[in-house]
């Protein structure tokens, strides 16, 4: 603004200096217009003209108060007047400039205020638009950030849950791993102990094997010697058995002779007394008992369809008496490993071990209905029995098949004899239902069926050697399949006794 005013003042002075060469237009009315352009603003200044010519009156040229010099006096007065005039003009211009400056300042204030107000309004609107846009963008970004934050939180929650689950799984796995490690350590310790024990056992086992080898060699030598002794004993036993059979036959012949002599004496006494009674034969021990003979012993019976009488042992003491003994084992003195013919006709002594004979058993049980009772005794002194209400066997063509009904007794809840019918087998007559030939494997003659749960005609074993013997005297449901009994007795009695 100061530069502008200085420029205006300088222009006014120059204009005044050159006023002598200018003309006033009659239209201007004695005024002069000066227009100044400053930026976008244009300012017009109206300057008043001085009345009269540029020169002062001649009276002023000769003012007595003017300074005088050595130069011509007329020119000095003119210069003084001119300076005074210029000073006066300068004062006027100064006043006008002050007015102009005041006017400009006032106008500039209002214009600047208006400009500032417009600028502020424009800036405010722009700022409002920018602020609105920023608020919208901020809200949108906030919403997006909220969504992202929600997603991040959800993902973080999932990750935290997964992390917790993984932590739990890891903890469980670590716990299981520790347990398994402890178990492995315990197993390792046990294995170490077991290995140590195994080493010790191997050493002991080697020592025992060496001892057993020595004992085996000694036993083999002993077995060889015993085998030779047994063979010699068998030979002697066979010879003794042959001699015993001869003696038994001689004894039977003597008993028959004595019996005949007794009968003859009885007949002679009756004839002498004038009384003659008809002799009544006994069919079995029941008839003997009913005839008044109640003492156990050997009696002669007459069996239907048999050509000769038969000596039998009658048990008159057990369960009412009247029992005909058909089989008895007690001491192993008689060999029961015999053939078909011997089992057919019987063998042994009725007062000891013997077998009555299948043909005689068939003949007796064909006379009437009989009950079978089997008495058993083990090596511990325990007695038991099995009883069958109905008992009979078939003829030789039927292989002396066994028929039984109605089992009772104390020698097992089940029958050790085959109830549905089994054929009799011996070492030379295999009639069983097994491909193994039970009579050869189990010894003796019996109703084996498929080797079955019983064999009372098996090998006799003494005390201490009677265990684990499948071919012994066995009754399965009393003492098991491999226990050999001490004594057995098979006897029959009429059902209606």
Swiss-Prot record:
InterPro entries: FIB_ANG-like, Fibrinogen-like_C, Fibrinogen_a/b/g_C_1, Fibrinogen_a/b/g_C_dom, Fibrinogen_CS. Residues 153-261 form a coiled coil. Transmembrane segments: none annotated. GO terms for molecular function: receptor tyrosine kinase binding. Keywords: Angiogenesis, Coiled coil, Developmental protein, Differentiation, Disulfide bond, Glycoprotein, Secreted, Signal. GO terms for biological process: angiogenesis; blood coagulation; cell differentiation; Tie signaling pathway. The keyword Signal applies. Disulfide bonds join 285-314, 438-451. GO terms for cellular component: collagen-containing extracellular matrix; extracellular space. Glycans are attached at residues 92, 122, 154, 243, 294. The keyword Glycoprotein applies. It comes from the Eukaryota. It is found in: Secreted. Residues 276-496 form the Fibrinogen C-terminal domain. Residues 1-15 form the signal peptide. Its main location: secreted. Binds and activates TIE2 receptor by inducing its tyrosine phosphorylation. Implicated in endothelial developmental processes later and distinct from that of VEGF. Appears to play a crucial role in mediating reciprocal interactions between the endothelium and surrounding matrix and mesenchyme. Mediates blood vessel maturation/stability. It may play an important role in the heart early development. Homooligomer. Interacts with TEK/TIE2. Interacts with SVEP1/polydom. Interacts with THBD; this interaction significantly inhibits the generation of activated PC and TAFIa/CPB2 by the thrombin/thrombomodulin complex. This is Angiopoietin-1. It comes from Bos taurus (Bovine). The lineage of its organism: Eukaryota, Metazoa, Chordata, Craniata, Vertebrata. The gene is ANGPT1.
């Amino acid at each position: 603004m100061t530069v502008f005013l200085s420029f205006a003042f300088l222009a006014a002075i120059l204009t005044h200096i050159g006023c002598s060469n200018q003309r006033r237009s009659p239209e201007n009315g004695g005024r002069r217009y000066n227009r100044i352009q400053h930026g976008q603003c244009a300012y017009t200044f109206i300057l008043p003209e001085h009345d009269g010519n540029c020169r002062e009156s001649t009276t002023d040229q000769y003012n007595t108060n003017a300074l005088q010099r050595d130069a011509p006096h007329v020119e000095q007065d003119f210069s003084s007047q001119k300076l005074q005039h210029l000073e006066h003009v300068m004062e006027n211009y100064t006043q006008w400039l002050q007015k102009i400056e005041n006017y400009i300042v006032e106008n500039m204030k209002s214009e600047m205020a208006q400009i500032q107000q417009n600028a502020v309004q424009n800036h405010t609107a722009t700022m409002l638009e920018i602020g609105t846009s920023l608020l919208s963008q901020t809200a949108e970004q906030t919403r997006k950030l909220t969504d992202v934050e929600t997603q991040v939180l959800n993902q973080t929650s999932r990750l935290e849950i997964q992390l917790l689950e993984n932590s739990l799984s890891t903890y469980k796995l670590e716990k299981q791993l520790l347990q398994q490690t402890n178990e492995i350590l315990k197993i390792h310790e046990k294995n170490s102990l077991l290995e140590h024990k195994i080493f010790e056992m191997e050493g002991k086992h080697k020592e025992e094997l060496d001892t057993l080898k020595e004992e085996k060699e000694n036993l083999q030598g002993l077995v060889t010697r015993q085998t030779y002794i047994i063979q010699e004993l068998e030979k002697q036993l066979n010879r003794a058995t042959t001699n015993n059979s001869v003696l038994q036959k001689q004894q039977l012949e003597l008993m028959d002779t004595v019996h005949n002599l007794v009968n003859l004496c009885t007949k002679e006494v009756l004839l002498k007394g004038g009384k003659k009674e008809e002799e009544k034969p006994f069919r079995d021990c029941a008839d003997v008992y009913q005839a008044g003979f109640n003492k156990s012993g050997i009696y002669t019976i007459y069996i239907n369809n048999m050509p000769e009488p038969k000596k039998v042992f009658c048990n008159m003491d057990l369960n009412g008496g009247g029992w005909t003994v058909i089989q008895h084992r007690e001491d192993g003195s008689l060999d029961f490993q015999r053939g078909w013919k011997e089992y057919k006709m019987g063998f042994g002594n009725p007062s000891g071990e013997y077998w009555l004979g299948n043909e005689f058993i068939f003949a007796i049980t064909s006379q009437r209905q009989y009950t079978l009772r089997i008495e058993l005794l083990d090596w511990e002194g325990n007695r038991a029995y099995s009883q069958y209400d109905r008992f009979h066997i078939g003829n030789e063509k039927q292989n002396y098949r066994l028929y039984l009904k109605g089992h009772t007794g104390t020698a097992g809840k089940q029958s050790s004899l085959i109830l549905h019918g089994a054929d009799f087998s011996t070492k030379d007559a295999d009639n069983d239902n097994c491909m193994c030939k039970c009579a050869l494997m189990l010894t003796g003659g019996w109703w084996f069926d498929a080797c079955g749960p019983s064999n009372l005609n098996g090998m006799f074993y003494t005390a201490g050697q009677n265990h684990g013997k499948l071919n012994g005297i066995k009754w399965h449901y009393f003492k098991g399949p491999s226990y050999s009994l001490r004594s057995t007795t098979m006897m029959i009695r009429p059902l209606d006794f």
